[in-house]
């Protein structure tokens, strides 16, 4: 963790995927928007709140497009760029694709930040794109009151490999590939209450590319995928349940958490986005009686560059989990199962 002359987080009112508009607000904004005639080539659009748009270009191939940007959740400019780039790339992997190029999205308060700081943000993002073997082929920049950085990413995918958030089937096992708690860690960081060890753990998690999703999509026993980001495990779980018309049964005791997440949440170091996520999705969630507020906050904790939530055939679940672990995801865990029923997430 580097000391920065200006704390990037002091220049932003929010950070990471906790900056996302509340789902309920987003629904209001998108309601009654003019709709173009249906496009046969648009295989995935806005209908199920999936991770990216997918456009079929011929019988076998499609293009995947996504964009993600946010304000800083850390002060080290290079680390900010790395997290933002990994987060943007994740949507391509979650759909089963592989990225081919990115465009940078940059808004900076140039009167408050030196050029060297902004250059370091861009360098951090470029380093992650280099790790993903893609170029940053251009972009757009503005002078803005708060620092903003992210990417628009284009990827390719075989039509047969597309993995939506709407394919979960009753009986499927649920696998989560990364630990939960990035939002809690970022809240603690903002208040200078995060240990150096926890910071390093957060950086390792948020900069770990989800490219295993591309490999998993070639397995016919993997039925649905989504990445867990700003709406938290519950929010993205509800989207998966609604997309497939199923219920998700998740065992709280099996959920992998970052090492200090539960302690920090119990101490009240949670984000405002956690409450907004509950307000938007809580009506589709069943919690045990007497669930403490801190547990609920962890379940709705906004993740930045979070893990993949995967629904797969139960008889292959352990083998698939092992494949994920071997790809560099030591926290990959089977956390529950898919059941028939009204779309909901049920926590046990």
From Swiss-Prot:
Lineage start: Bacteria, Pseudomonadati, Pseudomonadota, Alphaproteobacteria, Hyphomicrobiales
HAMAP family in alphabetical order: SelD
Gene Ontology MF: a single term: magnesium ion binding
Gene: selD
Positions contributing to ATP binding: 20, 48-50, 68, 91, 139-141
Segments traversing the membrane: none
Reaction(s) this enzyme catalyzes, per UniProt: hydrogenselenide + ATP + H2O = selenophosphate + AMP + phosphate + 2 H(+)
Signal sequence residues: none
Top EC class of this enzyme: transferase
Pfam families assigned to the protein according to its UniProt record, in alphabetical order: AIRS (PF00586), AIRS_C (PF02769)
Protein name: Selenide, water dikinase
Swiss-Prot/TrEMBL cofactor(s): Mg(2+)
Family the entry assigns: Belongs to the selenophosphate synthase 1 family. Class I subfamily.
Native species: Methylocella silvestris (strain DSM 15510 / CIP 108128 / LMG 27833 / NCIMB 13906 / BL2)
Keywords on record: ATP-binding, Kinase, Magnesium, Metal-binding, Nucleotide-binding, Selenium, Transferase
């Amino acid at each position: 963790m580097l000391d920065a002359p200006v704390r990037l987080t002091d220049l932003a009112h929010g950070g990471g995927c906790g900056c996302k508009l509340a789902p309920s607000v987003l629904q209001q904004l998108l309601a009654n928007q003019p709709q173009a005639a249906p496009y046969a080539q648009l295989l995935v659009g806005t209908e199920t709140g999936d991770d990216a748009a997918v456009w079929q270009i011929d019988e076998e191939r499609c293009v995947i497009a996504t964009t993600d940007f946010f304000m800083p959740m850390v002060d080290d400019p290079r680390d900010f760029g790395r997290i933002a780039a990994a987060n943007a790339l994740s949507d391509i992997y979650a759909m089963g694709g592989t990225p081919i190029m990115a465009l940078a999205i940059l808004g900076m308060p140039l009167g408050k930040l030196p050029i060297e700081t902004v250059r370091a943000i861009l360098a951090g993002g470029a380093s992650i794109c280099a790790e993903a073997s893609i170029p940053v082929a251009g972009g757009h920049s503005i002078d803005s009151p708060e620092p903003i950085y992210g990417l628009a990413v284009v990827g390719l995918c075989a039509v047969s490999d597309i993995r939506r958030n709407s394919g979960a089937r009753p009986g499927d096992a649920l696998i989560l590939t990364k630990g939960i708690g990035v939002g809690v860690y970022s809240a603690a960081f903002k208040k200078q209450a995060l240990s150096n060890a926890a910071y390093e753990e957060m950086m390792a998690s948020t900069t770990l590319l989800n490219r295993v999703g591309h490999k998993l999509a070639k397995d016919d026993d993997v039925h649905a995928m989504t990445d867990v980001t700003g709406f938290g495990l519950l929010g993205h779980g509800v989207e998966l349940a609604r997309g497939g018309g199923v219920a998700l049964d998740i065992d709280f005791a099996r959920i992998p958490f970052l090492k200090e997440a539960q302690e920090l949440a119990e101490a009240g170091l949670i984000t405002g986005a956690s409450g907004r996520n509950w307000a938007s999705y809580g009506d589709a969630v069943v919690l045990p009686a007497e669930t403490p507020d801190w547990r609920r906050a962890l379940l709705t904790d906004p993740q930045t560059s979070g893990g993949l939530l995967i629904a797969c055939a139960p008889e292959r679940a352990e083998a698939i989990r092992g494949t994920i672990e071997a790809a560099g995801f030591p926290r990959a865990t089977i956390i529950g199962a898919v059941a028939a029923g009204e779309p909901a997430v049920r926590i046990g």
